[in-house]
Amino acid sequence: MENKGFELVSTYKPTGDQPRAIQELIEGLEQNKKSQVLLGVTGSGKTFTIANVIKAANRPVLLLSHNKTLASQLYSELKDFFPNNRVEYFVSYFDYYRPEAYMPNTDTYIDKTTKSNWDLEEMRMSTLNSISTKRDTIVVASVASIYGALKPKEYWSAFYNISIAQKISRKEFLLDLVQRGYKRNNVASEPGSFNAKGDFVDIIPAWTKGFHIRVEFFGDEIEKISTIDSNNKITIEKFKEYLIFPASAYTAPTGTIEAAVLRIREELHQRLEYFEKEGKLLEKQRLEDRTRNDLESLEEFGFCPGIENYSRHVDGRAEGEQPFTLFDYLPNDALLIIDESHMMIPQLNGMYNGDRARKLNLVNYGFRLPSALDNRPLQFHEFEKYEFQKIYISATPSDYEINQAHGEIVKQIIRPTGLLDPLIEIRREQNQVEDMFDEIQKQKAKKQRTLILATTKKVSEELTRYFQEKKEKVAYIHSDYTTFERNEILRKLRKGVYDTVIGINLLREGIDLPEVSLIMVLDANKESFFRSKKSLIQIVGRAARNVNGRVIFYANNISKSMEETIYDNLDKRKIQMDYNKKHNIIPKTIIKPITEAIEDKKLNESLISFMSHSKTKKSIKEKEALVKDLRNQMLDASKQLNFERAAELRDIILELEAN
């Protein structure tokens, strides 16, 4: 396996708590600590710290993020830090996914509906290839990493190494390509295809659009191997030998499929006998028809729709045996980094139960064989069995992560900008509405923005109405808003179109509002998920991008969560102030450009108009034109590695198509 080492490229130097955090984490790895926790406040440069640890550790890395938006941001940042190494992106390749399900109470069967994104599938394949062949690889992945994948040995067995002067006929070579999932296509250059003309064979990889592979023959011998630029057809590089990867991440040898078909037939026979014995003739007929159709496709094409439901048989696993995942492609000394671990760990823990509950209905009512239950994500105890060294990252790590690290926490409290954690003030609930109104006036005078967090939709709506009647520029964000509408309100807040935004949960990922210097929290003492210590600390952190950051808790008494949050805040502020005083640092508000998700002004106006009149009938052509333009912008954003914008555009497109 190739290993040229990680090369960190940056104009930054570690500052504040970063040097100490980097050193402690590296020492922990060298001491073979199984788990470490990095507690880093918002804006403290945790990604840069981790980049330095990756460089020093010099081993393959899997970094888990709990959603695609944050994963894309991390991927983009790490690509910038490591331009000369492999940085890969592994998330679900579905732009839209509605899983197969059956609801017995209404006798409703819902077939699986998906919309695949080939760019994401290409990146997933690139991930498998890089992690299999290069040690200087970083993979940024979502929860998709714990879902089933082809058995690594099956995938690796399809790797095809060729070299100049290799004795092989052109016909044999083409047959070898077909066995690895490639399809002949002399008309169009589609990923995972090849075209053969004369002595030339051009292979179109499924893992990149940048080039295709040209193999030239002289008789029954390979004469030349080169990569050709896909756009200008110029030769990029010539090779003495070349490793060709399979055409698909699910390419299985012919013998494997044949063996799987035999096992599927045997299971089908047993299940049909069971339904016959139980008198469930409808379920028996349904299962027999569906499965025999799948078997015919498998025998003829080596593939069938929903082949993943037979993955246990394709892999040769026993009933209940753990599925293979991306984790099984990693070497034993890989480093596992879990970002926003307070969110990621519960997500990993919850995937299996939801998946199994849905599939049990499909099995019980004859839509799937029982083996479909083994097409599943990892159970949490299976995830824990992997013995990779782990680093958990969070501003609010949970007890689980802290216990895994035996109570040891690496803290990163100092921000490179010198910004302090916001001041917290407690005010009584009496006359709180009038008090908030007065605070908004002060904020307006300073040209600074405000967030108000309520606990119920009713209170949020009443507050919004009250302030609007007072002629205040106030907006309310609620769960019914689309991604586009929500983001548009936050952009208008930053621009000053609104002075205040009211909501229940404004802590969703990706919110970065430097103009917000005041957050007012209603019912701060009402213990709940949104008023827990972790949530309150996250709320306070949202005002930490502004030098004048403040938070007001409205409460008639102090809850335990409030008390712990305030003590945490005071401790951090003291550390930060002492550091700034010692190093003569003057805190400065973060400057962040306000960008439009939709860069074309006319397109932006059309979309706003379309969304605002979504209840009226719009022409299909108008919507199709909007979607086409948005998709072009999304692809451009992806090419420019602006994955945050690309993900936002993707969500807007899906909402438009569902409208």
UniProtKB/Swiss-Prot annotation:
Domain spans labelled UVR: 624-659
Nucleotide-binding among keywords: yes
Sorted UniProt keywords: ATP-binding, Cytoplasm, DNA damage, DNA excision, DNA repair, Excision nuclease, Nucleotide-binding, SOS response
PROSITE patterns in the cross-refs: HELICASE_ATP_BIND_1, HELICASE_CTER, UVR
SMART domains hit by this protein: DEXDc, HELICc
Residue window of motif Beta-hairpin: 93-116
Domain of life of the source: Bacteria
Binding residue positions for ATP: G40, V41, T42, G43, S44, G45, K46, T47
Pfam families assigned: Helicase_C (PF00271), ResIII (PF04851), UVR (PF02151), UvrB (PF12344), UvrB_inter (PF17757)
SUPFAM superfamilies from the UniProt entry: C-terminal UvrC-binding domain of UvrB (SSF46600), P-loop containing nucleoside triphosphate hydrolases (SSF52540)
Keyword check for Cytoplasm: yes
Helicase ATP-binding domain sequence ranges: 27-414
Transmembrane segments: none
Localisation: Cytoplasm
Positions of the Helicase C-terminal domain: 432-594
GO molecular function, one term: ATP hydrolysis activity
NCBIfam families from the UniProt entry: PRK05298.1 (NF003673), uvrb (TIGR00631)
Subunit structure: Forms a heterotetramer with UvrA during the search for lesions. Interacts with UvrC in an incision complex.
Domain comment (free text): The beta-hairpin motif is involved in DNA binding.
Family listed: Belongs to the UvrB family.
Record function comment: The UvrABC repair system catalyzes the recognition and processing of DNA lesions. A damage recognition complex composed of 2 UvrA and 2 UvrB subunits scans DNA for abnormalities. Upon binding of the UvrA(2)B(2) complex to a putative damaged site, the DNA wraps around one UvrB monomer. DNA wrap is dependent on ATP binding by UvrB and probably causes local melting of the DNA helix, facilitating insertion of UvrB beta-hairpin between the DNA strands. Then UvrB probes one DNA strand for the presence of a lesion.
Protein name as catalogued: UvrABC system protein B
Organism annotation: Mycoplasma mobile (strain ATCC 43663 / 163K / NCTC 11711)
